[in-house]
Amino acid sequence: MEKQIKIALAGNPNCGKTTLFNALTGSNQFVGNWPGVTVEKKEGKLKKHDDVVIMDLPGIYSLSPYTLEEVVARNYLITERPDAILNIIDGTNLERNLYLTTQLTELGIPVVIAINMMDIVRKNGDEINVKELSRELGCEIIEISALKGDGVMDAAEAAIRAAKGTKTVPMHTFSGPVEHAIAHIEEAAVHSMPEEQQRWYAIKIFERDDKVLEKLTIPTETMNHIEEDIKAAETELDDDAESIITNERYIYIAQLIKGCYKKKSTEKLSTSDKIDKVVTNRWLGLPIFAVVMFLVYWVAMVGVGAPATDWANDGVFGDGWHLFTIGAADYEEATAEYDDQITRRD
């Protein structure tokens, strides 16, 4: 009898994970609750593959146990250790979804990524370089539309191949101080674990994850040495350990998106923005400034300035002033006669 293959579906809430689960299993699924909690548990057999079980994990944003759903999903992944993880990503919101991906690839379990809603991505005019993203993350990526059923069986077949192949090796690394501390933690606290699991546990110890520390019961002396490494990294990077890991994940994701994702520009530039774009150009700015200053000088000194100055000099303050005295003598004579008549009457 062939060994049963377990594939876990993992992804953010509302990424299309449950739609994909229904498409893969049809009516051949079982619904219940996870032991001890009210979180729904769904599993089923892959269509036409009785030896493949699909587990629909609760929607989560990370593997840090902040919510009940995250606790349930994480416990299943690190305890049951499925043969492969099919990570569903919303293609219209890569940055948020890839945060979980960076953690899943550290578990030492084969990971296949299914980028969902690719039909919407294309409709929006956006582009995802799937080949480059796959190379950077170190795992196979399949484009799907769970709602339309496009590519769903291709994603399942890729997960089956991954389950029978090699483990996913995380491609991203953290900064020097963090990697230095993680290496010491692996050597001091988790060296007896299977090699593919060591890095994830070391990162969680660096983050001071309470549930991991409680599970491992690391000797006090060893933990004191580890704390020295963690505090050294915190001092050098001026932040707490958990925030350091979070920030560096997002820095890595930003670099991924910059190289693999191209968003269609939908902004229409206003007239003033278009002018600004030209006049502030590093190559055109100075020539345009010189031309504008020349025009201002020409208008002031030649175009308007010279005629206006000539008119003022000749017409107002020069010989032209006599124009204003035309008829003045007659006016003065008439005024004098009028004054004489008034005097005689008196």
Explain the meaning of each model-derived region:
Residues 1-66, 79-80:
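Conserved G1/Walker A P-loop phosphate-binding module
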Residues 46-49, 72-141:
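Conserved C-terminal guanine-recognition region of P-loop GTPase G domains, centered on the G4
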Residues 73, 261-278:
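Cytosolic juxtamembrane amphipathic/interface segments immediately preceding
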Residues 112, 122-265, 335-338:
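Alpha-helical transmembrane helix bundles of large polytopic membrane transport and channel proteins
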Residues 267, 279-289:
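Membrane-interface helix starts
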Residues 288-299:
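Hydrophobic core segments of alpha-helical transmembrane domains in multi-pass membrane transport
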